[in-house]
Amino acid sequence: MRIAGVDLPSQKKLEVALTYLYGIGKTLAKEILEACQLSPDLRVRDVNDEQSMRLRQYIEQKYLIESDLKRVESMNIKRLMDIGCYRGRRHRALLPVRGQRTRSNARTRRGAKKTVAGKKLAK
């Protein structure tokens, strides 16, 4: 089964397979299956065409997923950077945005250490 350009693994249960879509986690997958009146224990390979069409239409109408969601997220970050607010400046400087300390740690966000040469001793 294919939803929003993503192939869902056929051997997995529907509840788990839906989490392969960017923007859908376990809780949202349960809500979607409940709204579409599908069993969470149903395997992807056992879903018939009518059920898959109902599921696909419900997801595409109600939720932003995959590339649409990624585009909205990147536009939000770009807007923060354009208006020059604190969060935008932190994004631009590739530093942690949510108040984490940077004196030690923050290596993932800041990248690998840049070694600075020490003072040379005169002999």
Swiss-Prot record:
GO cellular component, one term: small ribosomal subunit
Subcellular location as annotated: Plastid, Chloroplast
Region of interest (Disordered), ranges: 99-123
Gene Ontology MF annotations: rRNA binding; structural constituent of ribosome
Gene3D superfamilies assigned: 1.10.8.50, 30s ribosomal protein s13, domain 2
Skewed-composition ranges (Basic residues): 100-123
GO biological process, one term: translation
UniProt key word rRNA-binding: yes
The entry's keywords: Chloroplast, Plastid, Ribonucleoprotein, Ribosomal protein, RNA-binding, rRNA-binding
Pfam families: Ribosomal_S13
Principal localisation: plastid
Membership in a protein family: Belongs to the universal ribosomal protein uS13 family.
Function: Located at the top of the head of the 30S subunit, it contacts several helices of the 16S rRNA.
Quaternary state and interactors: Part of the 30S ribosomal subunit.
HAMAP family named in the record: Ribosomal_uS13
The protein, known as: Small ribosomal subunit protein uS13c
Species annotation: Cyanidioschyzon merolae (strain NIES-3377 / 10D) (Unicellular red alga)
Lineage: Eukaryota, Rhodophyta, Bangiophyceae, Cyanidiales, Cyanidiaceae
